[in-house]
A protein has these predicted regions:
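Conserved donor nucleotide-binding strand/loop of the catalytic core
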Residues: 35-38, 49-81
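Short active-site alpha-helical segment characteristic of glycosyltransferases
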Residues: 180-187
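Cell-envelope/extracellular polymer assembly enzymes that use nucleotide-activated donors
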Residues: 3-5, 36, 183
């Protein structure tokens, strides 16, 4: 039986959190997984947490940030709390359908499996606006050249970890905003974990909270600090 934790960072997701959780639970129950879902509310100012709790699903756990601390902070809290053999973090909008986890779980010898929108075999059902796509490609190009070569898409919010890898990597994560994905992949490389990139299905949502230009510059700044901070980070 597959043992799986799913971490969902959520900020002002009251319009879809219930449907997201119902979709995930229906899938996991149908597959008869041993599972837990961890919702990390990142200081939402709407009814996200209230709605999620009112569903009263026994296998959902909740963490609450009293103020908005960033996606990276929220994912880190959830990953360090997770208890199952495999740990997935997924965006609250399910831009990558939960069923895509089946592809990743087929590679049992991999420590970190990265959902990718850029690989051959990926399928983009709804594209981002062109300025977002080009901005994302530019960021990915720089990241590919400077930090994590051979990973084509670092920013897709659908990544699977073995528990042991997740605990070691996220315990030393320092970037708390949207650039955290790059840091955890860099750390995975530094620690010598086996990384695989898997093509997935993905759809853009018009109300995405990613601000490509402002957050793009922040990611680049975070990269500079990260390289200096983790230069000597490796498994002892």
């Amino acid at each position: 039986m597959i043992s799986l934790s799913i971490v969902i960072p959520a900020y002002n997701e009251s319009q879809r959190i219930a449907e997201t959780l119902k979709t995930i639970i229906h899938y996991l129950e149908d597959k008869q997984f041993d599972y837990e879902i961890i919702v990390v509310d990142d200081g939402s100012t709407d009814r996200t947490l209230e709605i999620a709790r009112n569903l009263s699903f026994q296998k959902i756990k909740f963490l609450e940030n009293k103020v908005n601390c960033g996606k990276g902070f929220s994912v880190k809290r959830g990953m360090l709390m997770a208890e199952k053999t495999w740990i997935l973090f997924a965006d609250a909008d399910l831009s990558t359908p939960i069923r895509e986890i089946e592809k990743m779980l087929g590679f049992q010898d991999v420590d970190v499996n990265v959902g990718s929108r850029a690989m051959k075999g990926s399928q983009i059902l709804i594209h981002q606006p062109s300025y977002r796509e080009w901005g994302g490609r530019f960021i990915n190009f720089l990241v590919h050249m400077l930090v994590v070569p051979n990973i084509m898409d670092t920013q897709c919010g659908f990544k699977l970890f073995k528990k042991e890898a997740a605990k070691e990597i996220f315990s030393v994560q320092t970037i708390m905003g949207f650039g955290f994905d790059i840091e955890i992949l860099y750390l995975a490389r530094q620690f010598g974990y086996k990384i695989l990139e898997t093509p997935v299905v993905w759809s853009h949502h018009a109300d995405s909270k990613v601000a490509p230009f402002r957050q793009g510059f922040q990611i680049l700044w975070d990269l500079c600090k990260m390289r200096a901070r983790h230069r000597h980070t490796y498994r002892k």
